[in-house]
Amino acid sequence: MSPTHQIQDPKHWNRIADSDYLWRSLSLQRWDCSNFTNQHLGTHTWKQFFLHQRRKELQLALAQPHNFVYKVTKNIAFETELAYLSGNRLTVDEQEKSIICSVSPKQELCAWDVQEGTMIWSSPVQEFHFSNLVTLPQMHLAITMDRKKTIKVWNCQDRDALAVLPMPQPCYCMEAYLTKDGPFLMVGDAAGDIYTFTLPGLRDISKVTAFQYGIVLLHCSPDKKWVFACGTYSRTLPQVFLTESLLRPSEGSAPLSTFLPHKLCASACWTPKVKNRITLMSQSSTGKKTEFITFDITTKKTGGQTVIQAYEIASFQVAAHLKCPIWMGASDGYMIVFTSGPYLLLFSITGFLLQRFEDHQAAINNFWVDPCYVLTTSENSVHVYMWEEGGRHPYLRSCCHLENTWHDHTTDSCISSVMCDNASIVLTVTKVSDSSILVMYSLNT
């Protein structure tokens, strides 16, 4: 058959439309599933995987309050954030549960079945308070740091930790991630050092002195190629490291890195869809001036050596009449979302206002963003937004508003953390005169 006849043949297009290459490419564009293998797929195809994920996303986006059931659990500590232990976001298993990790007032690490609202595992009571909690859902691992400067790795099944490692300095930030070479943990400490360890064994791989002051921000890029680090001292310049040089350090030579030429960095986020793009939020010491600066990070061969280069591609200042942003997020590489008082604002990276949402009456007091969803909270309500696929208008869709049906009006409280996966929304409500409660919403399927 000639090429012309092949193009006209419906069977030819059907083969293309069902090809694993096409559907895997579409999946990689939308989700961080580079480590998702044919073994994870089992008997399913990449087309089935893609359509299954999109169906789950839309179920949450299209849900209304009556589509949710909620469970309330009391006596949750408020020192650390929540973290999902389950990999519900990327799975072909219809029966997989949403599992969330939290810390009890007795300093136990706890795992909760969100759909059932029940605790399914807890660690022994710890002598020292937890100060940090991260998870690696792909490996079903939780990693904690306590106030004695000890890192522990848990599988949330066995009673005791899989690995324990005392650190020389307090650690302000941790990042767990999975690469083609395996799972790793990156830690930034109060002395300005970045440590890299294997997981779950916590074997030391490298130690890099990045700053003369403590590190408060440590973020891996979506493709795990870059690591952003920022110190506590606002006059120091943030740095971006090549992850490969931290995982495979060369004796006698410093890891590849570059400074981003903007001080006063208050926050930063990588762009899920343009994986080498990062946006910084810079704020003056008075908090009256906020600027967003976007960089593209690349490597270049110069004289036989590889160097990292950061290109500033866009920037803008937030108008003086807007309340100073606290949180920010990004999606397709060309838009920035942030809060200002009761408003959620979506700007282009060049400073053009694209959308303004007014779904809360009072100031937004918490914010969470990932490649699919944006969550905001105010007083005792949660609002759900969803990114439109492909950056189409409307770029961010307002979806669902959950009021405080679980709230005890006799006590003062506020939502201190919120997050979601494709099947659930969880939040911590901190009470002034009591310990926090955990509220777990799940779709009533």
Each language-model region and where it sits:
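Internal alpha-helical scaffold/solenoid segments in large eukaryotic proteins
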Residues: S2-H5, E116-L136, I143, R147-K152, ...
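Blade-level signature of beta-propeller repeat domains, shared across WD40, Kelch, NHL, RCC1
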Residues: V382-E389, P394, H409-T445
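Intrinsically disordered, low-complexity acidic/Ser/Thr/Pro-rich linker and tail segments
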Residues: S2-W121, H140, K152, T294-S315, ...
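WD40-repeat beta-propellers
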Residues: L109-D113, I151-C156, I194-T198, C230, ...
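Loop/turn residues immediately N-terminal
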Residues: K11, K106-L109, K148-I151, A191-I194, ...
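Loop/turn segments within WD40 beta-propeller blades
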Residues: Y84-K97, L133-H140, M174-P183, F211-Y213, ...
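Conserved beta-strand element within WD40/beta-propeller blades
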Residues: Q6, T91-D93, I99-S104, L141-D146, ...
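Inter-blade linker and blade-boundary elements of WD-repeat/beta-propeller domains
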Residues: S34, E57-F78, T118-S131, R159-Y177, ...
